[in-house]
Amino acid sequence: MRTHYCNHISATDIDKTVTLFGWVDRRRDHGGVIFIDLRDRTGIVQIVSDPQRTPTSYPIAETLRNEYVVKIIGQVSQRPPESLNPKIPTGEVEIYAESIELLNGVNKQLPFVVSSLEAELVKEETRLKYRYLDLRRDRMAKNLQLRHAVVKAMRRYLEDEQQFMEIETPILTRSTPEGARDYLVPSRVNPGQWYALPQSPQLFKQLLMVSGCDRYYQIARCFRDEDLRADRQPEFTQLDMEMSFMSEEEILDLNEGLVCHIFKAVKNIELPRPFPRLTYQDAMAKYGTDRPDTRFDLTLVDVSDIVKDSGFKVFSGAVKNGGKVKVLPIPGGNDIISNVQIKPGGDLFKEATDAGAKGIAYIRVKENNKLDTIGAIKDNLTEEQKRELLARTGAKPGYLLLFGAGDTDTVNKSLSRLRLVIGQRMNLIDPEKINLLWITEFPMFEWNADEKRLEALHHPFTAPNLADLNDLATARAQAYDLVYNGVEIGGGSLRIYQKEIQEKVFETIGLSLEEAYNKFGFLLEAFEYGTPPHGGIAYGLDRLVMLLAGEESIRDVIAFPKTQQASCLLTEAPASVDTKQLKELQVKSTYKPKVKEE
């Protein structure tokens, strides 16, 4: 039986006999003495096999190669001074192997060397295909351990300190398409009927509040059939929570306690409380996004009122058409950013146009506050407008002013993107800094131009601000998102718990009462049986762990992730199924593979 994990052996174990299991990370032969780095999920310890001191283990030690699986029994010894290795936790000790048992070898050539630093350069496709080897690597093993530690901290805080109950909700449920596409599962028992995999446990957790389970949580698997990005997967994990009889203020306070507990448990970092807050309106005005990275100070300035009557039609026309003109003032930007970068073909021009802008207007502030820009701007701004621009933006000599003009959404998207890119390039962002921020008072609805209707910004079960009930179309939501260094890690709201208000919200997004009862009748009926006021939040576990681990993709903190084509390279899922299975389900595929042209 194992007595220790590799990384847990220290100088306090000297002279003890230990039993270890693991993989051969490296094997070295130094003048007849064989050294083996033994690895398990915790780390590495050095094993020594000496033909004089440990003759019984030596013949097997000679045969070992990378990734062989072994059991080792040996005595812990102090390393000689010249062999000390301060780079690893076990660098003070080594184990003289009295017995080595080969449990399994490697029968094929390794696709990459697990222990080599070059494994970091291996293509991700190869790593995902041989994920069981990839997960042996130190970086990946640490990511999984961190994920476990985060979940453990969540459970301890919610259960031990806040009296939450962990309750599982169904994976097979009904399709209620609102937002992303559902993954559908045909029912063999009920031909022609379909289950859907849940996009979230939203409705069931609200029903649990009706049931009297007033503090619920779940580490929930969720499924969304949507286009993938670096921080999206078709199946993902949430910490899902719901609470009855709590105000928005109380929910935010409880969740700040949770997040602080996680950071202390896994990073030994004390976060200051309370977390700063910004309304959605203020966030969009200052940063152009509801997920601002507040680790650096560049902010947007609205100058629409100053330039609305200017002779420069790009500015005045934008305001006339109901849009905005905003500025990103960049201290020291004159020395860092060239005209080539801003003009067509430049990298910053491309960043802006990728976000929907037609281009970037600019003004450089020179000595004595002289303005350097293209003639069309310089000649069509009055001296008063120029003075007002400098005063409003606080610009001084050396500043570069980047302008966005057009519809408000495009201006915000393009300038917020430029703000982040420039902040990174000018090294304004401290990678060690942790800024957590609540965004509150979201709009209830946004306009869907394609479908020509309002749709819920979060979801249609979000409670409107009570002061806005008379005009739901423009109402603010009692909703809140938690943003960590510019990434949304959690979002929630108070919920509607009165049937009449829920019916009005459905009507506002274009659902008739008949449609609403067909899709959500079970929820509306439950509201007639004494539903308590309640609210909740869900955290993206994958995204949170990614940020804590310093990774750039959630695929590196998930044991067996999908690719950006929603496929598993290890198991080759998704895959076709035989016609017998389809026949049992009374399902027929109409897909016809495209014939490749010669």
Swiss-Prot record:
Catalyzed chemical reaction(s): tRNA(Asx) + L-aspartate + ATP = L-aspartyl-tRNA(Asx) + AMP + diphosphate
InterPro entries linked to this entry: Aa-tRNA-synt_II, aa-tRNA-synth_II, aa-tRNA-synth_II/BPL/LPL, Asp-tRNA-ligase_1, Asp-tRNA-ligase_1_N, Asp/Asn-tRNA-synth_IIb, AspRS_core, GAD-like_sf
Name the record gives this protein: Aspartate--tRNA(Asp/Asn) ligase
EC number of this enzyme: 6.1.1.23
GO CC, alphabetical: cytoplasm
GO molecular function: aspartate-tRNA ligase activity; aspartate-tRNA(Asn) ligase activity; ATP binding; nucleic acid binding
Binding site for ATP: R224, D225, E226, Q233, E488, G540, L541, D542, R543
Site (Important for tRNA non-discrimination): H30
Presence of the UniProt keyword Membrane in the record: no
A single GO BP: aspartyl-tRNA aminoacylation
Amino acids binding L-aspartate: E178, R224, H458, R495
Pfam families from the UniProt entry: GAD, tRNA-synt_2, tRNA_anti-codon
Function: Aspartyl-tRNA synthetase with relaxed tRNA specificity since it is able to aspartylate not only its cognate tRNA(Asp) but also tRNA(Asn). Reaction proceeds in two steps: L-aspartate is first activated by ATP to form Asp-AMP and then transferred to the acceptor end of tRNA(Asp/Asn).
Family: Belongs to the class-II aminoacyl-tRNA synthetase family. Type 1 subfamily.
CDD domains, A to Z: AspRS_core, EcAspRS_like_N
UniProt cross-references to SUPFAM superfamilies, sorted A to Z: Class II aaRS and biotin synthetases, GAD domain-like, Nucleic acid-binding proteins
Key words, A-Z: Aminoacyl-tRNA synthetase, ATP-binding, Cytoplasm, Ligase, Nucleotide-binding, Protein biosynthesis
UniProt main location, coarse: cytoplasm
Subcellular location: Cytoplasm
